[in-house]
């Protein structure tokens, strides 16, 4: 009877410890994925990170998982100590990873230096995460928690906990850690969770496997690692602020990290600049050249309603409100953080345009809105497409045949669409790709370009759903403009031999050529 009771108690303890261990497995898996997502996010924010960079990072991480599983084999005979060491090192490296990469981007002059930090961080984190499962499997098969005969069931439980933890990490990063804490603090908090999980495993499970002195040493090491990450957490704001300022020549006066992008506003004297993910969007010294060239060719004298896709800074809306006869402006912007900055920090620049009763602001993805929007029965007299350069697949779809076909449904008969199309000099293939893509959606297109000192030679596309390409013209009712007039606009349609027109295959959702064009253009 006594032996039966003892066996039952042992079984109950085994189940309890197994649950604790599997919970720790899930926590460690969540932490491992968060570390990699943090590196991916930071690389994308600071370096643009397209599909090629993302694919290489993910592939490198997966390869490192396998390498870690192989390299840990000689230490399986000392699985308990090895597990504690792996978790301590992983917690430190993972917790510090975002701060280290941020510092590398900020303080290393050469891109190769920060790329090396990213590659090393990916390899180390992947290798350490890959070592976890073999170590845990070995511990589970030592008879105190599970028997060797249950190896298949044990492996299934480990995999289930591992994948469930990865799911939790994948959801926690974009919906909780990144928006609430930011990249550096989010990674640091994850490191603390990682080390705490290792501590739980050490206290409740490994005390039966290692000596008392070894356990105390391990716990002290974990505590020291926790102290290091906690110190980073306390000073993370100073680190981030100092590092961020290193990336910009002028003092930063506003910063947001939204669910979509990093937004920075700088000011030096009267020169105010807006950056999205490190890319300059406008400079107040010359933005009027860009904005006037974008807006006025698209609005005829009789235009009443205008759709603006992108342009959340409010500059296009500012100019539209100056044009007599405009009664309605629908402004579609993906990122509410951009709208918030436009209504506060940028209010003097855009003249409070987004708070004008004639402007209706919609927070939505431009393509999604076009697919499901309640377009006025008569359509819009003009559509202004003022979107970021298509240097990622997400942005590339907004420069596709399918996108322009959707925009056509929003145009009134005879209405005009204008698209900012990048630089015909710096990114000529991308520029002419956009022109060809718009034509593939059934438009007749007239390309034109102007000089914007901050950007250099910058191009646009004026399009209409007719067989005859529209002639760019400044409306006769236009207000007094600082830069654009009919003579300037006529000259803008002339392209020199080194940037002469060419016909290319259109960029589509299936084949987003434009993204690769942008990458090669700026390279």
Swiss-Prot record:
Its EC number is 2.5.1.16. It is a multi-pass membrane protein. PROSITE patterns: PABS_1, PABS_2. The active site is at 386 (proton acceptor). Gene3D superfamilies: Vaccinia Virus protein VP39. GO terms for cellular component: peptidoglycan-based cell wall; plasma membrane. The keyword Ion transport does not apply. Pathway: Amine and polyamine biosynthesis; spermidine biosynthesis; spermidine from putrescine: step 1/1. Its main location: membrane. Residues 203-478 are annotated as: Spermidine synthase. S-methyl-5'-thioadenosine binds at residues 261, 333, 365-366. It is found in: Cell membrane. It comes from the Bacteria. Belongs to the spermidine/spermine synthase family. This is Polyamine aminopropyltransferase. It comes from Mycobacterium tuberculosis (strain ATCC 25618 / H37Rv). The lineage of its organism: Bacteria, Bacillati, Actinomycetota, Actinomycetes, Mycobacteriales.
